[in-house]
């Protein structure tokens, strides 16, 4: 269905277009039934989402950015003393804690200084980061998602807030590193697939400590030019021939 996923506030304008409606009206009717609020296109009740969001380009429109928590950054402003009556918490806050701070909580650092959180709206943000938040809004509690992300999102120090945000909203089930040839010839960006399940009191109760499955793809499935690598077999004459499945299709090596 042709909709700007990130700009959900304008969906109601899009669906009024006659040409669009002729093509997608049936799909739109089904999608509307999954909304948690019939008057809003923000939150849905999807059981499963599988996503490969676009990596290229940043979102720069302030109207869109303002709808997303992940378009904000957190800084800690130093105070001379803790304000009287303030709730003082030891240690640096996580990104979700800073987002939910109503201004009454002050944080005492390891050096003894006091800090208060300060949020700043970014002027641009990578699309894949916003898609993480958007897709989590699509999921119902207990719903599961698999999403392809650049490898850097998992280990860059600058993406710590993203990782904290994900861990706050869902259980990380697995991270599978893909081979660098997987998306060739279009891109050679190293990627991983993140598998998560949204926290839910019954289906996925929130816990602080749990196991996460990690794996790395060993077979490239494609060569360096981006052509698929197929499995071969030896026929009765001793010749090396392509291996076919029960439908007569070539089998990709994986």
Residue spans for each PLM region:
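Conserved S-adenosyl-L-methionine
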Residues: 1, 171-181
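SAM-dependent methyltransferase catalytic region
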Residues: 1-167
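Conserved nucleotide-binding/hydrolysis micro-motifs of P-loop NTPases
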Residues: 6-8, 54-57, 152-154, 180-183, ...
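Active-site lining segments that contact anionic ligands and/or coordinate catalytic metals
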Residues: 45-46, 142-146, 170-173, 188-193, ...
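Generic structural hydrophobic/aromatic packing signal, biased to beta-strands
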Residues: 49, 166, 175, 212-215
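Extended hydrophobic-aromatic, low-complexity segments
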Residues: 59-62, 147-148, 156-160, 175, ...
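Low-complexity, flexible helical/coil segments
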Residues: 83-103, 110-111, 125, 180-187, ...
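Flexible, glycine-/basic-rich loop-and-beta segments that form/coincide
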Residues: 185-254
